[in-house]
Amino acid sequence: MIINGYPCAYQDYGKRIIVFSNASRSHFIIQDIYAEFFRLCILQNNSKEFVIHKISQEYGVAESVVSQDFDRFTASLTRACSPSVLCSNPASAQLVVKDSDIYSLMSQDLVPFSATIEITDTCNLKCIHCYRGHPFHSYWTAATFEQALLQLRQLGTLHLTLTGGEPFTHPDFRVFLKLIKKYGFVLTLQTNATFDF
């Protein structure tokens, strides 16, 4: 998804939303009224006016107060998604948190925040230190992979690591990348970086 012009991935956990900004390479937590703003405005694509009116009516708060909160939310969201967060004090983004804090929250809630999938055991090298010992040639199918992505998304996973063997040897690797993007995961690759993709 794109937030304020920057690519991001998110997962909604009900009481909080965790967003990963590709531009700033940081996580941030959105909760309470900010989570409602995010759902109504960003996810449901409603106008600012609609969101302010709806929240005002729902909580019996003046629209001017909700409007101020909404403006603070959008300013914080813009700063959190922006690459400039890397160059400034992350605390100024208000929403940005340390990765260790995210993992601690997810552990408390028993959420598998990250997952590793070995999509193939095929490799283009024969390293003596490798646990594989001898070559195999099995691959996940695209259908099985998509089912796994759906299940991981439902469990609350946001980060996905692909490994193998060598993941680039998988004949459907590009299909897998499209599926990962479709379901909004943050991707990490473990590769030997010798394969000509």
Name each model feature, range by range.
Residues M1-L40:
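Acidic, low-complexity/disordered tracts enriched in E/D and polar residues
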Residues I3, S21-A23, K54, G133, ...:
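Preference for short coil/turn "hinge" residues that link or interrupt alpha-helices
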Residues N4, N22, N45-N46, N89, ...:
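Detector for Asparagine
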Residues S26-A115:
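Long, charge-rich, low-complexity alpha-helical segments
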Residues E58, R72, S76, P90-F197:
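Conserved alpha-helical substructure of the radical SAM core
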